[in-house]
Structure formats: structure tokens, C-alpha cells
Amino acid sequence: VRTVLVPDTAGGQSPDGWTVPVDADGRPLAAAEHHDDLVTFVRTCEETEPPRWIWTGTASVYPAFLRGGARVRRCHDLASTRAILNVRAGIPTPPEQSVDERPGLFDVAPTADLDSVLAEFAWQRVELRGRARLELLVAAESAGTLAAAEMGFDGLPFSADTHRQVLERTLGPRPVDDGLPPRITELNTRIGAVFGRALNPASHTEVLEAFRREGIEVPSTRKRVLRELDHPAVPLLLQHRDLSKLHSTNGWHWLDTWVRDGRFRPVYVPGAVVSGRWASRGGGALQIPKALRSSVIAEPGHVFVIADAGQLEPRILAAMSGDPRMTTAAGAEDLYAPVAATTFGGDRAKAKVAVLGVLYGATSGESRALLTMLRRSFPEAVEFVERAARAGERGEVVHSWLGRACPPPDAGFFAHGDARARGRFTRNFVVQATAAEWALCVLADLRLRLAADDAGELVFFQHDEIVVHTRTPETATAHLSAAVESATRLLFGATEVRFPMQVSVRDCYGADES
């Protein structure tokens, strides 16, 4: 069952709007129906015969339903599907519209009429017809938009009090009137004293000039460059950089803006990276520093089930290439161990360097010799990524397992582009994009399993890591394992390749694994 849903507005708790059931090709099966309360209508449908909702974009439409207590199982996100199809067609992605990223506001969906939504869906169905893998990608991407909206709405359990203690311990008491924290002010003074005059330690130009006055030519203020200097200002400058980053990125203003009611509520952006990986807006959800993870604390009676897919990209390469020996190696708990045993005399470190080198295009120096050895043992796996690299060097477009296309080279590539850089990009794209698809399929499957028996909530997702907040860790872990197996079969069929998840259960995200 498919139902097109077009709100008149997504603002408020109970938007009104139109719905119409359609067939697999997007043809209406009945007359359009207007609803004064779409939230109640959607909730009723989900309790009886849940359809796949077809709407303009989850990010703008779904929040109103979440606020009204209506959650949906499946949708077809026209915006994310259009983005996938446009890249495949070589159509440049338009710049994003300005979005108010402050959390908690009642966003208003862009206006759309029912006829245009029906026409868009019908066009997309034509483009997807007969392309089973691409249809799977679109379904997974749409499911990802639902998970992203729900995780942003529900939030990640976060102790504001613990975070304030971290800030005060590290930066000193909160400054008034948005001034600098005491520790940073103190460092400014100490750095000025070392150089004999006041300067702004955050200014690249002023720091270089200060060193130059002392007869020291420094090419940049990067950490690795500064660490090579024997100068009393260096440790102070490095400390200043760390404290300034904490203050500006996750300081008191960040806490006031993004943490409410004991939850960190970021804005996740599925498919924001060309490979299909996610990004985040405003709250920096995908970049929480280690020092702040101690503030991510499960609610009473709950724990976090934290799952990380180790060695994901090498295992994806094994499954994609079908290389018999690499597939066998990827059936082991540690993929590098059998690779080391068969090719590098048991040296696991060399095996890891070789495998990662072939994935990322490290083909010079020691890596070249290791690659030659790897090619002898795993010719099909090596040829798979090298074929993608050669295509990139020729300016061609390559695709993930399910059909996500990489962007074409820019207009000047054939005249003066860096063919080798393009080749390194396409070499990794085919694997990284497929890894993103696998992780997205796991996330989509797990989301439905958790909801079916109220076994927990998804609260964090980053590339190859998933975090569930739950009262029943055993059940959540079982659902996770089932989702991994399901996603693997869905993408690769009856493969020998295993995707073992490193699972830990913790009360605090930043604590040592139990």
C-alpha cells in the first residue's frame, strides 16, 4: 500500500492536508481526500494497515507528526530519491536552501501541491523500474531519513550538569556577557608574556609574526609543525587551541542551544556526503570529542548498547569483488590474520597496511611492494578497486553496489585535472559508498525491530557505529545481530563474508567497555 501525503503546512501540532492512495507506478487508485488533522489520520493508518508514505521530504514533513505522537514505519522520500537520481544523470546538486538550525522550532514545509507530488513520484518510478538494487538504495535512504528525524527529535541522553562540570574544570567558571573563559584569558596573558608583547593566539598571522620576531621561521601553526619547535610558547599555544575549540564547539552556548530536557538534540543530515555517509548540522553530533562523552549517560534503568562494525570496508571489498581467498579471509573474526598468514608470513601489521593501502590508493614506497604481494594472493579484490581507479583517472563515473553514483569530474578535469587524485577518489568511493549502504540497511532493519517490541530507541549513528538506548540490552543485542544478518543477505546474498560487530553495554558512552 502506497499513500501520497501532502500537508498544507507542516507547522503546529496538527497539520491539515491531502492524501491519495497510488499504485506501484504512482497512478491514483482513488480520489484525493482532505484531512483537517493529518496526525490523527496517519496514526490510525499506522495502527491498522500502515502504508509506505510518499512525501516531498522527511526533514520538513515528518517533524510535525513526531510532535503529534505519530510515527511511521516506511516512507518514500522524494527529495533524497531525486538527489540520487540526479547525480546518476550528471545533474549538479542545487545548493541547499537556508535552514534555521535552531532546535525546537516549528519548521514549515515548503509548499507543494498534490499534482506535482504525484508527477514527481510517477517520474521516479519510471527511473527506478527494473533496477532492483537502485530501488533498494532508495528504500534504505528513505528509511534513513526517518531514523535521522526520530533520533534528532528523541535526542541522545546527555547530562547537562556533568557537562557543565567538565567545562568549569577545564575552562573555569562560565564568563559573563559571552566573554572568554578564565583559563583562555590566562593563557592569552602567559603567551603574550613569553613573546614579550600581547597577541591573539588564535590568529595564524600574529603567531607566525611573533615567532619571526624571535628569528624562527615557521611555515604554519599546525600542531605537528609547532610540536617540532623547542620554544616555551609551544605548549601554551597547543593548550590554547584545545581549550578554544572546546569553548567554541561544545561550550556553554552549545549546551544552551542543543541540550534540552536531558537530551542532546542535533540535526542529522542523511546522505550529505557524496558517498552516502551522514553529516550533522549545528550540534556537531558526528564530532563529539572524547572529553564530552562522559556526559552521555543512560537514563535510570537503561543502558547503551554500542555496536561498531570493525574492518567494515575490507569486508565490503571482499563481498563486492567475490575474490575467493579474500572472501574466506573475511569469514574470520579478524580479516587481517588470514591475509597475514597467506601472504605476509604472519605479519598482521603488513597485512593491514597492504589492505588499507589498496583501498585508499597508497601505492608508493613500502606500500607498493606490499601491494604486489597482495595482488598475487588476492588478484580479484585488488583488480576490483584498481578498475575503479582507472575509470576515475579517465574521468568516468563509478557506482556503489546499489547504484549510488560518484559526482562527475569538474569541467576543467580533462584539460588540467589531477587524474591520480581522481583515481584515488573513485577507488575508495565504490567501497566506502557500499559500506554506507550496508550500514544504512542495518540501521533501517534495526529501527523496525526495536519499534516492534519496544526494545529500545536508536540514539546515535555514525558511519559504522550504532547506539541503542534500552532497558533490555540482551533483546536489543539480539535485534542488532538479526539486522546485521538481514542487511548482509539483502545486499550480498549467501556470502561467506561476515560482518562481526564489536558490542559493548555501558551506562556511560565514554566509559571503558564492560
Question: Model-derived features: where do they sit?
Answer:
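C-terminal polymerase-core module
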Residues: P175-V176, T185-D230, A362-A369, R376-E383, ...
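Hydrophobic multi-pass inner-membrane translocation pores used for secretion
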Residues: V1-P21, D25-H35, V305, E313-L317, ...
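Acidic, glycine-rich two-metal-ion catalytic cores of nucleic acid-processing enzymes
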Residues: R197-G346, W401-E465, L480-T488
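Helical catalytic core of nucleic-acid polymerases
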Residues: L78-L134, E141-D154, H204-T205, T221-R224, ...
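Generic structural signal for residues in well-ordered beta-strands
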Residues: V72-C75, L458, F499-V503
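Conserved DEDDh/DEDDy metal-dependent 3′-5′ exonuclease domain
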Residues: R2, G12-G130, E135, Q311
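Conserved "right-hand" nucleotidyltransferase catalytic core of DNA-directed polymerases
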Residues: V1-L29, L118-I288, G301-V303, E386-R390, ...
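Non-catalytic interaction-recognition regions
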Residues: P157, A309, H469-T470
